[in-house]
Amino acid sequence: MIYNLSFWRILRISIFIIFLFNFTYVCNIKYNVINKKNVSLVSDTLICREKRQKWWLWKTPSFLKRHSFSRIIKCCDKEQNNIGHFKKSICSLNYIPSFNLLLLLKKWEGLIKKKKNNHNFYEIAHNKITRNINSNWHLSGKGDINDYTKENDSNIYKDEEYNKNQYNDNKNDDTLNKDIVSIANSNLNNEMLHKYNIEQKNVRNFCILAHIDSGKSTLADRFLELTNTIKKKRMQDQFLDMMALERERGITIKLKAVRMNYKNYIFNLIDTPGHFDFYHEVKRSLNVCEGAILLIDGGKGIQAQTLNIFLEIKKHNIKIIPVINKIDLNTCIYDKICDDLVNKFDFKKEEILKISAKYGNNVENVFQRIITDIPYPPIKSNTFFRGVVFDSFYDQYKGVILIIKVLNGFLKKKQKIYFINSKKSYIIQEVGYLTPSMKPTDIIYQGDIAYISSNIRNFDDIEISETIINHDVVQINEQKKKIHINIKKSDFYNTLTNTDQHISNAINSDMDNPVSINFDNKENENLINIKETRCNPEYDLHYSDKKDVVMETNTIKEMSQIENSNIGTDKMHEKNEEFDEINIKDIAADKIDIAYPSVYCNIYSMNDKKCKELEVALNKLKLNDTSFSFKTDICETLGKGFKCGFNGLLHLNIIQERIKREYNVETIITAPSVNYLVKVKEKYIDKKLKAKLIEKNFDINSINIDVGNSESVKKEANETKTQNGMFFMTSNSNDIPQKNYIEHIYEPYVKTNIITPEEYQKHIMNECFKRRGIFIKKEHINDQIIFTFDMPLSEILINFLDEIKSSTKGFGSMSYENYIIYKQSDLYKIHIYINNKCIESLTFIAHKLNYQEKSKTLVSKLKSLINPHQFLIVIQAAIGSNVFVSEKIKPLKKNVTAKCYGGDITRRRKLLEKQNEGKKKMFTIGKVKLPPGIFTKLFNIKDK
């Protein structure tokens, strides 16, 4: 009992001492202010409400830290009487928040309840990003202010006997500074980036490029093994080829990014496809890498795609490491390939590495060359975040996942980002690295290849090569622009207080240092009147709706005079004309080259009920495939479908197969076609054709036309209607009018490279001339020849590569550039009729030199693919009304005379005549059923 009494006595004495200490501390500050010690130094800064009683200084650490006053606490502790130093500390932050939040009025006997109608604060909202927001707090490593205060604010208000409504009122007052406080301190950014720049010099971004079947995925497997990125239990061949189609066909379809750690280095590897139908994936990879491994098959040597890839790498001006793979083969021609690389590609012999990716021989040497030869990502001084999207995919839980390269700055969760092209804003939900599965992290830095998730569900908001920046940059730019315009319009300069001048000058001069102002000179100080000010929506410096006064004495009256701390200030905002606006488009990343579709066809769902599912599937596939495009199309026979663009027939087949496997939608595809440029004679334009032409109008300046007087043609085509006719572009042969309506048709040509052994050059020449190729040049590399032809795109789509392979016994290879030139051609529109009914989906365009051969081949294939019916089927090919090819499918036979085993012959004749009449009737009204996969078989869209 005695112990308890002594304990309570000691506790009471301790509480009294603490209270007395706080009371003395506050009274000391209050005494200096009330007795006008240095009042001229703070009179225009310490602004609060008028009260008849004494004042109380709010000094709760959580409150002050939340509003960036940690320096003020420190200064007050050291020099309690130096109010001038107190003000310098505020200004030296380059950040002046609402000062009503600094001083909270209280009665000496108790708290004054804060009523809404008595809310007469003089609020100064800065709305400008600051470079020194509470740097002491951040750099001390104690965490985020918001995280610290989130737990403590509610308890602080409760401890001060605020009720729930009062707490909410105070929280609403604090929202003025919420956005500003959340902006990262640029000094902190610089320190973080400086720390990371040391590590950034150990980052290497590179990709593996090669012709198909050269061992790219196998080399990537060895990289994963040697860096211990994947555990041995999980490791399997072609690990990065995660799609089932890739494993079945043994080809890479999509680029794959993976982050690996090797010793003290970070390797960001991108594995790319080798087939030229997916060449756009290679281009995207080169845009985000500082180096590339050029892999060559040791058994086959330099191939057509190897040459194209080398030229593409040279355009991007990045470091190339030549590597010869498959040296373990007995047929390896290492010396010959070395000579070709030295003579043709200007490599030095000591630069060329030889490895066996299958067995891992010499792969460690590749790592050393990556470290020494490939430069680290460029280090930029800009601290704001900027990144470029080079790939994306859809996750059913997280929405659209973006794969980006961080160009400068850093990005972390809960930051708000802005898409420059789509002008959309999102909040980051997750950031992380691909290892190769998604591994979340707290923050990503410049130079990193990483993924971000923002729960994006609208597919149209995202496009490849989109530039992402920190939303604060956009917000600050708009605020600076608004302040500049509003202050420029303002006639209110001379009535603003001295604090307003510091804010505006700091904003308009990119935050001049207010510490340089002489606050201690009190000679010849001017007197200004405190006038009634009301809220003006035009100003970015907001004023209270009530009357504002300045604390001067114990009792303050309206319209009283105070001393101005600055000398000779006649006009405020002298620097309001100086304003550097940030052009958001100027900070956008360079546009990534996008491969536009070269092959078009229509896709329809076999089940009309799944048309919506087909559209969703196409949207998701379009996310990570820049060369794939689609739009809605309506067909009379097949219903609603989609006109789709592809980069080749293999690309078409892959998309069709992915729709079937991943989205469970069976589809029908029409005949593949290319874009034709058509010029129509004006006198033959009817209303129907005119409506189509208006829909097809485009800027012909973006089209490369190979004609004698191309400039005059382009100038003529830019006008929608001219004396000679109109231009339009279409891939649908049904949109092309009759021959006599057309003045010219322009056909797309592409530059094609064919590499073959010298002994097969005659076969290659014959095949190219047969397909209307235009010879350009040929080059010799040892015993191989590189042919360059201008080939019609429509001719090389179907079976051309197969013919090259068969002509050269598998040693030849072919690739073409995705650069199209339109040449004038004599083309015919071929209609296919089945039982006198035109089948629009089978209509095609052919040249006058081979239209008969193509038509005969197509009709004979149709005859073999269509099953016999109970009536006669006639298949015809025609140009207009002129039928030049015809085939018949005989009807199924039924022995109607089998029951006539005797009697008069007239009975047998009557039964046969009745059968013939029925077949004639069925011929006119019967419908021919075409097999679902007829177009795939008809146009040889094979699984290559």
From Swiss-Prot:
<dbReference type="GO" id="GO:0045727">
    <property type="term" value="P:positive regulation of translation"/>
</dbReference>
<dbReference type="GO" id="GO:0005759">
    <property type="term" value="C:mitochondrial matrix"/>
</dbReference>
<dbReference type="GO" id="GO:0005743">
    <property type="term" value="C:mitochondrial inner membrane"/>
</dbReference>
<dbReference type="Pfam" id="PF00679">
    <property type="entry name" value="EFG_C"/>
</dbReference>
<comment type="function">
    <text>Promotes mitochondrial protein synthesis. May act as a fidelity factor of the translation reaction, by catalyzing a one-codon backward translocation of tRNAs on improperly translocated ribosomes. Binds to mitochondrial ribosomes in a GTP-dependent manner.</text>
</comment>
<dbReference type="InterPro" id="IPR035647">
    <property type="entry name" value="EFG_III/V"/>
</dbReference>
<dbReference type="InterPro" id="IPR000795">
    <property type="entry name" value="T_Tr_GTP-bd_dom"/>
</dbReference>
<dbReference type="Pfam" id="PF00009">
    <property type="entry name" value="GTP_EFTU"/>
</dbReference>
<comment type="similarity">
    <text>Belongs to the TRAFAC class translation factor GTPase superfamily. Classic translation factor GTPase family. LepA subfamily.</text>
</comment>
<keyword id="KW-0378">Hydrolase</keyword>
<feature type="binding site">
    <location>
        <begin position="271"/>
        <end position="275"/>
    </location>
    <ligand>
        <name>GTP</name>
    </ligand>
</feature>
<dbReference type="Pfam" id="PF06421">
    <property type="entry name" value="LepA_C"/>
</dbReference>
<dbReference type="InterPro" id="IPR038363">
    <property type="entry name" value="LepA_C_sf"/>
</dbReference>
<dbReference type="InterPro" id="IPR035654">
    <property type="entry name" value="LepA_IV"/>
</dbReference>
<feature type="domain" description="tr-type G">
    <location>
        <begin position="201"/>
        <end position="379"/>
    </location>
</feature>
<keyword id="KW-0999">Mitochondrion inner membrane</keyword>
<dbReference type="InterPro" id="IPR009000">
    <property type="entry name" value="Transl_B-barrel_sf"/>
</dbReference>
<dbReference type="InterPro" id="IPR027417">
    <property type="entry name" value="P-loop_NTPase"/>
</dbReference>
<keyword id="KW-0547">Nucleotide-binding</keyword>
<keyword id="KW-0648">Protein biosynthesis</keyword>
<protein>
    <recommendedName>
        <fullName>Translation factor GUF1 homolog, mitochondrial</fullName>
        <ecNumber>3.6.5.-</ecNumber>
    </recommendedName>
</protein>
<dbReference type="GO" id="GO:0003924">
    <property type="term" value="F:GTPase activity"/>
</dbReference>
<dbReference type="GO" id="GO:0005525">
    <property type="term" value="F:GTP binding"/>
</dbReference>
<dbReference type="GO" id="GO:0043022">
    <property type="term" value="F:ribosome binding"/>
</dbReference>
<keyword id="KW-0472">Membrane</keyword>
<keyword id="KW-0496">Mitochondrion</keyword>
<feature type="binding site">
    <location>
        <begin position="325"/>
        <end position="328"/>
    </location>
    <ligand>
        <name>GTP</name>
    </ligand>
</feature>
<dbReference type="GO" id="GO:0006412">
    <property type="term" value="P:translation"/>
</dbReference>
<dbReference type="InterPro" id="IPR013842">
    <property type="entry name" value="LepA_CTD"/>
</dbReference>
<dbReference type="InterPro" id="IPR000640">
    <property type="entry name" value="EFG_V-like"/>
</dbReference>
<dbReference type="InterPro" id="IPR006297">
    <property type="entry name" value="EF-4"/>
</dbReference>
<dbReference type="InterPro" id="IPR005225">
    <property type="entry name" value="Small_GTP-bd"/>
</dbReference>
<keyword id="KW-0342">GTP-binding</keyword>
<feature type="binding site">
    <location>
        <begin position="210"/>
        <end position="217"/>
    </location>
    <ligand>
        <name>GTP</name>
    </ligand>
</feature>
